[in-house]
Design a protein with these regions (language model features):
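Short, flexible turn/loop "capping" segments at secondary-structure junctions
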Residues: 38-43, 81-82
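Phosphate-handling catalytic interfaces
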Residues: 46
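C-terminal accessory module of base-excision DNA glycosylases/AP lyases that mediates lesion recognition
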Residues: 1-35, 100, 120, 124-125, ...
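Alpha-helical ds-nucleic-acid-binding substructure associated with the helix-hairpin-helix region
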Residues: 8-12, 22-23, 54-133, 185-187
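Short secondary-structure boundary/capping segments within folded domains
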Residues: 34-39, 53-55
Length: 197
């Protein structure tokens, strides 16, 4: 999907929602949409879980320790959660809850639940149901996976506070649109709207 080609249409649609939104989109230009699917899905999910509810700096530090441990022990992530002592992983800065989630991801990966090709064929809603059945994976994580790993074109992550707050800022008080109805104007490319936010 060429975001540069979509950009003028997005600005026009944004103008229907609010002039400040259109001006902001026009000023920033087409967003980047980084692809994360080069790495194994289980590893990507592990990285997301490790970073949840932490500052970027803390998440990066802890993930760096986990990566270094995996390299030193010649263990893949998250499989190392099943193969190394809990104390070793907790010493990296992981919480007990995140360690349990990494173990669940490793088990799911070993069972074939996290096969990228299989999950990619599912509709995003069906995929989200499967993923949120895993320990520690909630709707926000499923949405981020749909956006950045699978690059589904029409994901509107209502659970993402930054996305919601940014769009709310542009909805003027007299606007006839609320968050959902404003986002609906951008279907079937609401993922791109989320990237602008």
């Amino acid at each position: 999907m060429d975001l540069a080609l979509l950009h003028p249409d997005f600005v026009r649609t944004a103008r229907r929602v609010s002039r400040p939104l259109a001006q902001a989109m026009d000023a920033v230009g087409p967003p980047d949409w980084p692809s994360r699917h080069q790495q194994p899905l289980a590893r990507y999910l592990a990285r997301v879980v490790v970073g949840q509810q932490l500052s970027t700096r803390a998440a990066s530090t802890i993930w760096g320790r986990v990566e270094a441990l995996g390299k030193a022990e010649q263990q893949s992530i998250p499989a190392l959660a099943l193969n190394l002592p809990d104390a070793t992983l907790l010493a990296c800065g992981l919480s007990a809850g995140k360690l349990k989630t990494l173990k669940a991801l490793a088990e799911a990966d070993a069972a074939g639940v996290l096969k990228r090709q299989r999950l990619a064929r599912l509709e995003p809603a069906a995929r989200a149901i499967e993923l949120t059945a895993l320990r520690g994976i909630g709707p926000w994580t499923a949405d981020m996976l749909a956006l950045f790993y699978f690059r589904d074109p029409d994901i509107w992550p209502l659970g993402d506070l930054a996305v919601r707050k940014t769009l709310e800022r542009f909805l003027v008080t007299q606007s006839r649109y609320d968050l959902s109805s404003a986002a609906a104007l951008f279907a079937p490319h609401r993922s791109v709207l989320a990237l602008y936010m």
